[in-house]
Structure formats: structure tokens, C-alpha cells
Amino acid sequence: MFLQKIVLYLSTACMFCYMLGKFLMLVILQFFSPSLAKKFILRMGEKITMTQNPRFNYEDWGLTFMSLAFIKTASSHMWLSLGEEAFVGGEAPDSPVVTMDREKTSISKYLKGNRPLVLSFGSCTUPPFMYKLDEFKQLVKDFSDVADFLVIYIAEAHSTDGWAFKNNYDINQHQSLEDRLSAAQVLVQSEPLCPVVVDEMTDVTTIKYGALPERLFILQAGKVLYKGGKGPWGYNPAEVRSFLEKIK
């Protein structure tokens, strides 16, 4: 795990520098050539499904990538990711979660024998997570005979009182477990076809899995079998499908 941690620290440092560089470039471009800045942002938006999402227009989200709220939120996500302990081939962190009935449990309770367990971390205010919910639901339908699925609701990616997008779900960042359960209930209404639990307010599970703002994992027999990239770029249900097809 030592080498994996070193790689994690170095990659996070590189990502932080990249984020700052991109931010400064966009701010400068916006000042001298707003049309060119928009072109760059739309290209980025295509990679994270924002331009494909019918819920949003460019004006709802594009300019927020040049805001201090973006820097603050993205930096916080990177800082928390340094506590990541879930690595492919290693032990899956058995961290605590809370059911929708307010019962404390843990990740391992959802592992059944040698069946794979797909974990999907996310929140309603994360547009790519919600945009790909139907794709995730199709995974549940197609592979429920060989695998189990669990959605873990975590801190809001784009809370109304944080890095907010217009026309998004109106949910403030959670100040209590009741807030988080209430937000998760919004997701439950979309019928994800599998159990939904929430992370504790310490965000311990989110941190150990490096899950902000969204992420996919496959666990089996207490080990990490598959670890998707960090969202929004790395949240890819198609990769999970390919992985499960090999073991079906």
C-alpha cells in the first residue's frame, strides 16, 4: 500500500496543479476572448456529459468553472482523497454506512459469499451521476443474477450553498444525518433498483474509497476487484458492464 499511497499523493498534486492552471487559463481567456473560453468549456463539458444532458444549458454551469466556489470545492475533494485506502487487489475498507431506516451497518454486510458487489457513490446534485442513473439501473437489471449492487449517497457535489449549477436539484450541503437521508430519499424516488445507504457525517466511507464527487467499485470476497476513475470523467458504468460480462 505504501507505493500506492505515494502514487496517490503525486497524482493528486499533479491534478491540483492542472486544475489551477486550467482555472487561470479560462479566466484569462474569458477576459480576452469569451467565445474561445466557451469553446474550451464546452469541449470539457462534452467529456463529462454536461453538454449531452438535456436538463442544462451552458449558461447553467459553464461560467462556474471560473469561480472561487469551483476552486474551493475541487480542492476539498482532492484533499479528502488523500485518505483513500481502497486499491485494486487490496482489502476493501469495511467502513460504516447508514440505511434509509437509520440503522448503522457497514459495507461488508452487503457482501454475499463470492458474489461481486458493485458500489456506486454519488449525490443528486452531481449531474453526470444522475444522467447515468438509467445506465446504472440497466446494469442492475442485466447482472442481478450474478452480482449485488449498492448505492452510497455522499456529500453533495453541487449543493445550492456551494459550487452550484442553475436548474439543478435544490439541495444544500448536509449539516446533519437527517439532511443526508432526506437528500438520499430524492434519489430513492428515482428507483435505482438496489439498496441505497448514506455515508456517515464524518464522510469516512467517502474518504477511504476516494469517492468524491462520484465513483464506481466492484468488491468480491472482501477485496477490491475493480476501481473506476474519479468522477465525473471516470464514472463509467460501461466499464463495470464489461467487467461483469467477463464473469457472468
Curated annotation (Swiss-Prot):
UniProt topology in membrane: Single-pass membrane protein
E.C. number(s) listed in UniProt: 1.21.99.4
Alphabetical list of Gene3D superfamilies matching this protein: Glutaredoxin
InterPro entries: Iodothyronine_deiodinase, Iodothyronine_deiodinase_AS, Iodothyronine_deiodinase_I/III, Thioredoxin-like_sf
Keyword S-adenosyl-L-methionine applies: no
Secretion signal span: none
UniProt-listed PANTHER family: IODOTHYRONINE DEIODINASE (PTHR11781), TYPE I IODOTHYRONINE DEIODINASE (PTHR11781:SF22)
Protein name: Type I iodothyronine deiodinase
Organism of this sequence: Oreochromis niloticus (Nile tilapia)
Origin organism lineage: Eukaryota, Metazoa, Chordata, Craniata, Vertebrata
